[in-house]
Amino acid sequence: MTPVIIKNIECFITRPDRHNLVTVRVTTEQGITGHGCATFQQRPLAVKTLVDEYLQPLMIGRDANNIEDLWQMMNVNAYWRNGPLMNNAISGVDMALWDIKGQLAGMPLYQLFGGKSRDAIPAYSHASGETLEALFASVDALIAQGYRHIRCQLGFYGGTPSALHAPDNPTPGAWFDQQEYMSNTVEMFHALREKYGWKLHILHDVHERLFPQQAVQLAKQLEPFQPYFIEDILPPQQSAWLEQVRQQSCVPLALGELFNNPAEWHDLIVNRRIDFIRCHVSQIGGITPALKLAHLCQAFGVRLAWHGPGDMTPIGVAVNTHLNIHLHNAAIQEFIPRSATTNDVFPGAPEVKEGFVYPPVQPGIGVGFNEALALAHPVLYRPHEWTQSRLPDGTIHTP
């Protein structure tokens, strides 16, 4: 097979809307270019440094055909591995290599992987409101667009803002009352079922804001409302408690958007403590490890619901879609609407039609990258306040 030699690797950060999006471009000596998503919204400049200063000199002159070998080399080259910075940098290169391979084969990625398992993947999007009435309006708008799977949040992300029993001169942050949140969430599910019945598939994100005993309690309280799944009911470092949740509730559990290391998901999958894996593909190192994770999940009956937030490039969205179209155990795709400017920077990205996402059909990933327009929207970084979640006494908590 003719070698496809890597000539250059570049990293771009663009902010066409409210998120800093990180894109990696790999160029071969034959002039073929591939693009990948390396977005780490909270640390974009660090990812760019890793790509520019470390991965670029490591990869130039190597054969782009050998994706598995190149991924393994990038993974161990720094000796220390499996962190969010390095994984995202590796992901950008890895996705770009798959993009190149698809172009060389003349196939969209899902065909390169082995073809379709389904015609389209069901999508879900986010509904929220400060009041139940506002939440209903948000749900109604999504139903009108064809969605039948909707993530519902009442008030502040995961719950409502709390001014209860706050200390004098409280530390700045996103204050959060766990007991208030739990009560409001049960009320929300009851109201949603009363209004929409059982045809609407309701998802909810706890966003790891509970203590383990509270997670058990909430899972039991939500069981009568039959949620499609409850996401991140506990943080990764408390995942051993999922056995207790499992023993006391049959609510489907989804976990994984914060995972970086295979050791974080292996036991949960093998012991069947989760129903859905929610890993962020770039956060675990790209397409190459995502395929392996998906096959592990299939062997143990765990379904795929890749993390798909607004702070990922449309290239990453398309990768999720290609994986979902191919992989038999894919369940659903998270989908966040994009601005017109973002679509101009990344032309050809997937869209939702009547509640389903369809993959690009062009060879490779199938999403373009307008460099000139991307550079017209440069990076703008500021500290993220929403991650400074605090309990009513001012204690910092997992966001």
UniProtKB/Swiss-Prot annotation:
UniProt KW keywords: Magnesium, Metal-binding
Keyword Metal-binding: yes
Superkingdom per UniProt: Bacteria
Molecular functions (GO terms): magnesium ion binding
Binding site for Mg(2+): D205, E231, E257
Protein residues bound to D-arabinonate: H207, E257, R278, H307, E334
Positions of transmembrane segments: none
Gene Ontology biological-process annotations: amino acid catabolic process
Subunit annotation: Homotetramer.
Function, in words: Has no detectable activity with D-mannonate and with a panel of 70 other acid sugars (in vitro), in spite of the conservation of the residues that are expected to be important for catalytic activity and cofactor binding. May have evolved a divergent function.
Protein name: D-galactonate dehydratase family member Ent638_0932
Species whose genome carries this gene: Enterobacter sp. (strain 638)
